[in-house]
Design a protein with these regions (language model features):
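Short, conserved phosphate-binding/catalytic loop or strand-edge motifs used
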Residues: 61-62, 95-99, 107, 146-151, ...
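N-terminal structured subdomain of primase-like DNA metabolism proteins
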Residues: 5-111
Length: 322
């Protein structure tokens, strides 16, 4: 819904949506319900079960599975079932119940924040495409980057799926190409793809590395990780990651969550591994319900993210990784 980009749903409208949404009707779109006493029961849509333990209470306006614990009001149900954000679920219900959404205009400050965020995502998309192109079509990309991924045993379809790339040895190759294409220096710096030197030169943060884009839950590129391949220069950090930014808060993101969320719901379990390549290797061997916290222990924000899909987290750190 790009139509809604610049607006917010006001509280009065939210209240009207919540009042109108009949929990039994909302759940019935997805679950076959039978009346039992004052409530309704059905098979839980969030885990596999033979005996109905999913209960819906019209009087309370709530649903709950007594086996897996998932549930809540109509909005929570739609968020969980359709993997929607809170505003998306509200819009879904507004549409179902023909409620017109009166949206307040954003303040100029809010508009600026939003257009900054959009510009940053656009720059990140450009960088992802740029790194992917180098991996496939540039001589170093193929002989160094692609060779490394092939040596790890990664298939081409997996390399494409995770949008892997390569950055050349040039210290400002990305910066120059981006400026030439009309991207603003401001956003190259804000995303952390580039930085300014003391004498005001624009330099790339990532060079001579294989590149791993980090995706949000909805598949947008928020950050990058780059791994150095040459071993001669011992001073180089093995991994370089995007710095925190307006769009990237490391403690709220998990590598691979976008590619894993459906499998996590289906298997009702999430495997947590250490690094990017562990996630990719497991996908390639058919295990898709896997994410990486990139070496750090799980933050409360990351745990909340996983808990949107399952309560079961299994940690597979070095030693367990076959």
């Amino acid at each position: 819904g790009d139509v809604y980009k610049r607006q917010m749903i006001d509280q009065a409208t939210i209240d009207r949506i919540l009042d109108a949404a009949q929990i039994v009707e909302v759940v019935s779109d997805f679950v076959t319900l039978r009346k039992r006493g004052v409530n309704y029961v059905g098979l839980c849509p969030f885990h596999n079960e033979k005996t109905p333990s999913f209960s819906v209470s019209p009087s309370k306006g709530l649903c709950k599975c007594f086996s897996c614990g998932k549930g809540g009001n109509a909005v929570h149900f739609i968020m969980e079932h359709e993997q929607m954000s809170y505003p998306e679920a509200l819009r879904y219900l507004a549409k179902k119940y023909n409620i017109e959404i009166k949206e307040r205009e954003l303040t100029n400050e809010e508009k600026e924040v939003q257009s900054n965020r959009e510009s940053m995502f656009i720059v990140n998309n450009f960088a992802r495409d740029y790194f992917q192109n180098i991996l496939k079509n540039h001589i170093d990309g193929r002989s160094i980057g692609l060779a490394y991924f092939r040596q790890r045993g990664f298939r081409d379809d997996i390399i494409d799926k995770f949008q892997l790339g390569f950055s050349t040895e040039g210290r400002d190759a990305l910066a120059q190409e981006a400026l030439r294409k009309g991207f603003k220096q401001e956003f190259l710096v804000k995303t952390g793809l580039c930085y300014e030197t003391d004498d005001h030169k624009l330099r790339d943060r990532f060079w001579g590395r294989v590149m791993f884009p980090v995706h949000t839950l909805s598949g947008k590129v928020v950050a990058f990780g780059g791994r150095v391949l040459s071993t001669e220069n011992k001073k180089l950090a093995k991994y370089v990651n995007s710095p925190e930014s307006e769009i990237y808060h490391k403690s709220n993101e998990l590598y691979g969550i976008y590619f894993a969320k459906q499998a996590i719901v289906k298997q009702d379990r999430c495997f947590l591994v250490e690094g990017y390549t562990d996630v990719i290797s497991m996908h390639q061997s058919g295990v898709e319900n896997v994410v990486a916290s990139s070496g750090t222990s799980l933050t409360p924000g990351q745990i909340r993210l996983i808990h949107r899909f399952t309560n079961n987290i299994t940690v597979l750190y070095d030693g367990d990784m076959a």
